[in-house]
Amino acid sequence: MWLRRHIICRAWPEINDLMKNPFKNTAFLFGITKHKNLPEDVGIEILLSGRSNAGKSSALNALTGNKKLARISKTPGRTTEINFFEVEDGFKLLDLPGYGFAKSGHSRRKDWGPLLGEYFENRKALEAVLVFMDIRHPLKPIDLEMIELCESFDVPYIPVLTKSDKVSKNILMKTIQLVSKTTNAMEVLAISSSKETGFEKLRKILIGLKND
């Protein structure tokens, strides 16, 4: 009896942490550059998309509570792989290279068009897309292209406005309303990675998508 209580007491802090943040144990799996290297089409995948400087990597780190999970490059556009992160068995986050790929070369940018098209058209595991946008510069043409891609394949998407601490509450609300009116998104969220605000709601939505 004592041993059982001892084991439960030692395990409780970790269980409690997972209850607070179910993304806490998210781990990097691998990166791919070609459609043929995609893993088996099973489980649930959430695609993370956004411009090179939208704060997507910082958001992923804040979402999971692991500041070292996604490497934050000092030169936006360096990442050229789709990186797979496993939240739990059968539930993955896919980090797409930032739009523009300004430092990756024109030929590399051309390669991603067919890859994304094939992924959206054929991937049964794709559950939803998070479209990260700097709240100060939302709905750029490249953002709208991603949104149109989601809508053309009937893939649910959620605009996530980053760096919300950089604007006033008035501008924050107006921007959320603008994005809501401009898109057919299921919801619009505002987050701040530096202040760690907005992530509790984002986690609940993602867990809801997993369990849907």
Mark where each language-model region is:
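Conserved nucleotide-binding/hydrolysis micro-motifs of P-loop NTPases
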Residues: 78, 91, 98-101, 136-138, ...
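Canonical P-loop GTPase G-domain recognition
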Residues: 23-33, 167-212
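Conserved G1/Walker A P-loop phosphate-binding module
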Residues: 12-101
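Conserved C-terminal guanine-recognition region of P-loop GTPase G domains, centered on the G4
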Residues: 118-186
